[in-house]
């Protein structure tokens, strides 16, 4: 989603609150809870929940391994739910031609650098760079090349844009910023 006027362009960035993250966190939570319940049932020698039969599972080594997988899965699920709660990675890119400033804001993990705020002058922007890697794990990323700072990604690497969409976005942004486009 973006908002544009003659001199200002604001590009809103979706963070970790995506449908796929909700689905993975929920599936991982339920699966790891099931593993932990089966491991606990094999330790106790009786069914904690009748949905998960544990008579055939011996506690050593299968029950221990299932309990370990269940605990590890719960930790990973907790991590995913925390990133969703904190909306890590969300923010905005603001390009202001009137002031000649580019502002990039992202939410990070809680702590010292929770708010990530970058500010550049437009005159320091060298180019808009497109990096396309085709194949099994295709990757299309849009970068802003800053003099003395290197390349800053403007689009998340896990967003599945087509090559045409990336090129269109790069062309519009390069036209707005009045900088060239580089393709790698």
From Swiss-Prot:
GO terms for biological process: photosystem I assembly. The keyword Chloroplast applies. It is a multi-pass membrane protein. GO terms for cellular component: chloroplast; chloroplast thylakoid membrane; photosystem I. Keywords: Chloroplast, Membrane, Photosynthesis, Plastid, Thylakoid, Transmembrane, Transmembrane helix. It is found in: Plastid, Chloroplast thylakoid membrane. The chain crosses the membrane at residues 21-43, 58-80. GO terms for molecular function: mRNA binding; unfolded protein binding. InterPro entries: PSI_Ycf4_assembly. HAMAP family: Ycf4. Belongs to the Ycf4 family. Seems to be required for the assembly of the photosystem I complex. This is Photosystem I assembly protein Ycf4. It comes from Arabidopsis thaliana (Mouse-ear cress).
């Amino acid at each position: 989603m973006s908002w544009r006027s003659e001199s200002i362009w604001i590009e809103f960035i979706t963070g970790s609150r995506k449908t796929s993250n909700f689905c993975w966190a929920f599936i991982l939570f339920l699966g790891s809870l099931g593993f932990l319940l089966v491991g606990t049932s094999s330790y106790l020698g009786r069914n904690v929940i009748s949905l998960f039969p544990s008579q055939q599972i011996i506690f050593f080594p299968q029950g221990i391994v299932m309990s370990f997988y269940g605990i590890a899965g719960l930790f990973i699920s907790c991590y995913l739910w925390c990133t969703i709660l904190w909306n890590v990675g969300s923010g905005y890119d603001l390009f202001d031609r009137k002031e000649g400033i580019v502002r990039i804001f992202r939410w990070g993990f809680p702590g010292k650098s929770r708010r990530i705020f970058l500010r550049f002058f437009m005159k320091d922007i060298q180019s808009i760079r497109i990096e396309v890697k085709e194949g099994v794990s295709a990757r299309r990323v849009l970068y802003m090349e800053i003099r003395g700072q290197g390349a800053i990604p403007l689009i998340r690497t896990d967003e599945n844009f087509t090559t045409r969409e990336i090129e269109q976005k790069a062309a519009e942004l390069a036209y707005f910023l009045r900088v060239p486009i580089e393709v790698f």
